[in-house]
Amino acid sequence: NVMRGYLDPTKPFGIDLLPQGWHDTGDVVDVDSDGFIRILGRVKRFAKVGGEMVSLNAVEAYAQTVWPDHTHAAVALPDSRKGERIILFTDHSGATAEELQAWCKANGASELAVPKKIVVIDEIPVLGSGKTDYVVMQRMAAERFAEAKAA
């Protein structure tokens, strides 16, 4: 069920109706010819690299294709030159940017989707729901690369 509108805290019992019946959930979707909606990802799960929007979900999907028996999580950090840079965390000890880059090139994926850094960790943090905990991942990336800049 989707709500009919937003509750307005300044008007008890008042509901501001949604324009044209749409509610902005922050999801990126595809609506097929039968009207079925397929969720593709989240708006916030993009990095702006060199002026181009790169799906972090796609980066993870590429890594999953190259290393299917492992878990991966992509996050973006600010970059003074390119706007943002992509960091891929993985539990695969043999993961290399070169291997992922070769796969992307062979399969027509944008070179911008190749992470600048691949960080191997023991385990990708997850929420109670089993989904990747991107808040923790973002914090880990910021801390790790802040330390690298300071060194």
Please identify what each model-predicted range represents:
Residues 18, 23-25, 118-120:
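Short, small/polar residue-rich loop motifs at catalytic or cofactor-binding pockets
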Residues 54, 124-126, 137:
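Hydrophobic pocket-lining residues within nucleotide cofactor-binding pockets
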Residues 109-132, 148:
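AMP-binding/adenylate-forming catalytic domain of the ANL superfamily
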Residues 12-15, 71, 118, 128:
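A generic alpha-helix propensity feature with a strong bias for hydrophobic helices
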Residues 1-16, 52-54:
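Conserved ATP/PPi-binding loop(s) of AMP-dependent carboxylate-activating enzymes
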Residues 4-5, 21, 26-113, 132, ...:
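AMP-binding/adenylate-forming catalytic core of the ANL superfamily
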Residues 139-151:
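Acidic/polar alpha-helix N-cap and adjacent early helical turns
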